[in-house]
């Protein structure tokens, strides 16, 4: 490209640029273009300026572009001029306000001077008025205090008359005034806490007199109401109940009223109980459908049950009637008695009884009301039981008494006379039951024939009768509320333990004593086993009976099983003839392990077995034949030996164990016989060799040969061929 020719972008190029390749020198137009191009049109000022120009509706002409700056400056000057005019008006208004404020300050100063002069003139009058108002307020306060004091601490003459005069009735007005007087008496403690206690002492003395007179009036009124009211119905009127609650603040007077009430109710309830025993009533008229309780006197259980049911009904009614006095109305009576205990410390029974228990007081009052009935009940139950000797009925009466003991304990407490009477009756019935059993034992022991065991060796009749009497008792206890869940493995005492000991143990001891009449050991063992089995079978369904007696019975039965095993074992040995052989072989039995391990001595001894009388051919053959004859019917004969035992399972077990012991004995005898034959053969061979070496005579050799031939012909094993395996098969 030539120097001074235009560049491709239209800009002239200089030789210097062409030669050196450097950037051109910035010019004013270049700078302006760079400034325009670098301007960000997102700038808020630029955007606002453009929007303003757009709103003016200017045309983009050359004329407009030349005059735009001048037009804008003219508009700015006009705006500034209008602002200056407006500020001039504001300055004029401020001048007017300043003049008004100055005028107001002058007026305020004049008023201040007038007020100061007026205050100086009225200040003495105001001070005097303030002093008078203060005195008036003090007088009014004292008047209010005096009125309040009189209203709170002083009773009017009419109120005192209502409170203390016996001519005035005891009504709600009386109780209101009494409550106010008690409040006055209590509030006097505040007066006694001040410096001047005279007023408090005088008011307290007067209030104490009024209270004592009021409580005495109330006490006499309640006594009068008790005498005039119908005590057949223990329900008290609301006024009497309220009076008793108030009177409870004087424990001495209160207990005096309750004593009168309890004595009256005791007499009435005793009379009602006697009337129920002799004549049934329904209201004021005779009830033809109801009969006197005495009509069932022939049946002690029903008789006692009817009496207890009547006593329970009367006790429940008495408690419900008296609950309104002690428990209801939010415990007002309890609060009154607690206040009375505080006011009369000497009324406490002991130092610990500082809190009144309404429930306990209720139970004590019910107990006092029912004490006469309890005495009559105790006498009549004792008479009914004393002439009865049926064990089941006696136990059911005991169970019935136990039920009512639990019931009455919840109603009147464990320490009440009624519960104590029933507990005493239970002891009396139990002693009567023991007496009946002692009479039965005396009757049995008095007749010697009654102690002779039966021919079939079954349980004696007196024992079965005792069990027949015991089973209904156990069933009754099992179905009763007294039944405790008893673990079969537990040996703890339960409520039935005294009964079963009283009704069973004497007869069990008597049965054991009667077994001494049997001289035969087998018969005596069978008899004792049958007696134990019949008792065990009877008590087994009842865990509470098993808990105390099954361990003793099981121990005795285990001992008897051992005796039965010995009996069966001896029977098998005796009937098979093996007893003779075992007795003869006893000296040849190894005494110790060391001796049994010595081969020579044992063989020499075993060889001597053939010389025993029991092992001679004739005797051994007889025993072998006796064994063969017995084996086919051995199990049947052994079972028949114990057939009088009333437990096939027990007989079977004893026989099986005896058979096992017999097989062990037979195996021992068999091994001894085989050992004897082997020992004899060894001795025969040893004798022959010794004679040849020593050069003995021929007749001795012949004799030995003859003896050796006899040993072969006379073998113990040949004469006694049975094996242990055969015995086990035949006895299985």
From Swiss-Prot:
Task: Please provide the record's keywords in A-Z order.
Answer: Golgi apparatus, Membrane, Protein transport, Transport
InterPro entries from the xrefs?
COG6, COG6_C, COG6_N
Spans of biased composition, class Polar residues? Answer: 16-25
Query: Is Transferase tagged as a keyword?
Result: no
Write down the superkingdom of origin: Eukaryota
Region of interest: Disordered: 1-27
One GO BP on record is: protein transport
Family, according to the entry, reads as follows: Belongs to the COG6 family.
Name assigned to this protein: Conserved oligomeric Golgi complex subunit 6
Q: Gene name?
A: COG6
């Amino acid at each position: 490209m030539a120097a001074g020719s235009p560049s491709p972008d239209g800009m002239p190029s200089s030789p210097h640029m062409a030669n050196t390749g450097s950037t051109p020198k910035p010019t004013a137009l270049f700078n302006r273009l760079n400034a325009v191009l670098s301007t960000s049109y997102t700038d808020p000022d630029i955007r606002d300026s453009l929007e303003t120009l757009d709103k003016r509706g200017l045309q983009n002409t050359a004329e407009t572009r030349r005059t735009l700056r001048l037009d804008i400056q003219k508009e700015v000057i006009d705006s500034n001029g209008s602002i200056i005019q407006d500020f001039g008006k504001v300055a004029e208004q401020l001048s007017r306000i300043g003049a008004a404020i100055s005028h107001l300050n002058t007026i305020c100063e004049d008023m201040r001077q007038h007020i100061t002069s007026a205050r100086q003139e009225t200040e003495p009058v105001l001070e005097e008025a303030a002093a008078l108002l203060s005195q008036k307020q003090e007088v009014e306060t004292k008047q209010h205090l005096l009125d309040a004091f009189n209203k709170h601490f002083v009773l009017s003459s009419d109120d005192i008359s209502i409170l203390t005069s016996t001519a005035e009735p005891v009504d709600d007005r009386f109780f209101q005034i009494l409550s106010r007087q008690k409040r006055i008496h209590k509030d006097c403690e505040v007066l006694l806490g001040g410096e001047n206690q005279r007023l408090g002492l005088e008011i307290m003395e007067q209030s104490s007199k009024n209270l004592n007179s009021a409580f005495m009036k109330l006490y006499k009124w309640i006594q009068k109401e008790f005498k005039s009211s119908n005590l057949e119905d223990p329900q008290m009127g609301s006024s009497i109940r309220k009076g008793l609650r108030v009177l409870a603040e004087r424990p001495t007077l209160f207990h005096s009223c309750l004593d009168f009430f309890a004595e009256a109710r005791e007499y009435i309830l005793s009379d009602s109980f006697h009337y129920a025993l002799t004549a049934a009533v329904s209201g004021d008229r005779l009830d033809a459908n109801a009969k006197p309780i005495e009509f069932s006197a022939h049946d002690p259980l029903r008789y006692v049950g009817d009496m207890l049911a009547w006593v329970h009904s009367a006790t429940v009614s008495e408690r419900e009637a008296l609950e309104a006095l002690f428990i209801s109305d939010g415990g007002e009576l309890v609060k009154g008695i607690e206040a009375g205990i505080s006011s009369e410390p000497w009324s406490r029974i002991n130092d610990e009884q500082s809190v009144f228990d309404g429930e306990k007081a209720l139970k004590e009052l019910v107990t006092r009301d029912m004490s006469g009935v309890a005495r009559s009940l105790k006498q009549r139950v004792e008479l009914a039981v004393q002439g009865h000797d049926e064990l089941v009925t006696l136990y059911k009466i005991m169970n019935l008494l136990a039920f009512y003991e639990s019931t009455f304990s919840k109603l009147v407490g464990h320490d009440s006379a009624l519960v104590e009477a029933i507990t005493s009756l239970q002891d009396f019935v139990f002693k009567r039951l023991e007496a009946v059993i002692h009479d039965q034992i005396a009757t049995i022991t008095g007749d010697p024939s009654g102690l002779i065991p039966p021919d079939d060796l079954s349980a004696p009749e007196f024992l079965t009768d005792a069990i027949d009497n015991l089973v209904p008792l156990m069933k009754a206890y099992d179905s009763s509320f007294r039944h405790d869940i008893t673990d079969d493995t537990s040996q703890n005492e339960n409520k039935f333990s005294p009964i079963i000991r009283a009704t069973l143990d004497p007869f069990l001891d008597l049965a054991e004593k009667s077994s001494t009449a049997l001289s035969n050991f087998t018969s005596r063992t069978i008899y004792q086993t049958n007696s134990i089995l019949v008792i065990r079978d009877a008590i087994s369904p009842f865990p509470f009976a098993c808990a105390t007696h099954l361990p003793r019975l099981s121990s005795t039965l285990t001992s008897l099983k051992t005796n039965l095993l010995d009996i069966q074992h001896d029977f098998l040995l005796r009937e098979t003839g093996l007893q003779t052989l075992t007795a003869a072989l006893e000296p040849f039995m190894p005494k110790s392990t060391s001796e049994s391990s010595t081969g020579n001595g044992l063989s020499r001894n075993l060889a001597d077995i053939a010389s025993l009388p029991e092992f001679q051919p004739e005797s051994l053959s007889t025993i072998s034949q006796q064994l063969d004859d017995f084996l086919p019917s051995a199990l049947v004969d052994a079972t028949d030996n114990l057939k009088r035992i009333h437990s096939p399972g027990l007989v079977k077990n004893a026989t099986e164990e005896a058979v096992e012991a017999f097989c062990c004995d037979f195996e021992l005898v068999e091994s001894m016989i085989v050992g004897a034959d082997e020992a004899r053969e060894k001795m025969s061979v040893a004798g022959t060799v010794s004679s040849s070496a020593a050069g003995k005579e021929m007749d001795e050799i012949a004799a030995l040969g003859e003896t050796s031939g006899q040993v072969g012909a006379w073998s113990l094993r040949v004469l006694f061929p049975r094996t242990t395996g055969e015995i086990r098969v035949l006895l299985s």
